[in-house]
Swiss-Prot record:
Protein name: Large ribosomal subunit protein bL17
Keywords linked to the UniProt accession: Ribonucleoprotein, Ribosomal protein
Native source organism of the sequence: Oceanobacillus iheyensis (strain DSM 14371 / CIP 107618 / JCM 11309 / KCTC 3954 / HTE831)
Entry GO CC: cytosolic large ribosomal subunit
ATP-binding is among the record's keywords: no
Gene Ontology molecular function: structural constituent of ribosome
Oligomeric and partner information: Part of the 50S ribosomal subunit. Contacts protein L32.
Length: 117
């Protein structure tokens, strides 16, 4: 892991799991630039697992992502394997885009939007 994000390991992994789950659900989130860049590699790996589509890949993704509800019928794992992976079936990597924004007014942190392409 390249960036520590000012947190200890457990807190950092919980943050990234939460952000990865939210990105898969909403397909676009606004966060700091460092978090977005760190999140990019994790989400790319999750989408690659989704494209593989076998039981072991599903269990690996379920072990990392939080089991959040996307709507009444689906959760984040179902959305990853059914919707998101199918969309990128012909694409070899590069599933996310990081767009830089202005600094946050309160503390001047560099902000960015990370979204699924």
């Amino acid at each position: 892991m390249a960036r520590k994000l000012g947190r200890k390991t457990d807190s950092r992994m919980a943050l990234l799991r939460n952000l990865a789950s939210d990105l898969i659900i909403h397909e676009r989130i606004e966060t700091t630039e460092a978090k977005a860049k760190e999140l990019r590699s994790i989400v790319e790996k999750m989408i690659t697992l989704g494209k593989r589509g076998d039981l072991h890949a599903r269990r690996q993704a379920a072990a990392f992502l939080y089991n959040k509800e996307t709507d009444e019928d689906n959760n984040v794992i179902q959305k990853l394997f059914d919707d998101v992976a199918a969309r990128y079936e012909d694409r070899q990597g590069g599933y996310t885009r990081v767009l830089k924004l202005n600094e946050r007014q309160g503390d001047g942190a560099k902000m960015a939007i990370i979204e699924l392409v």
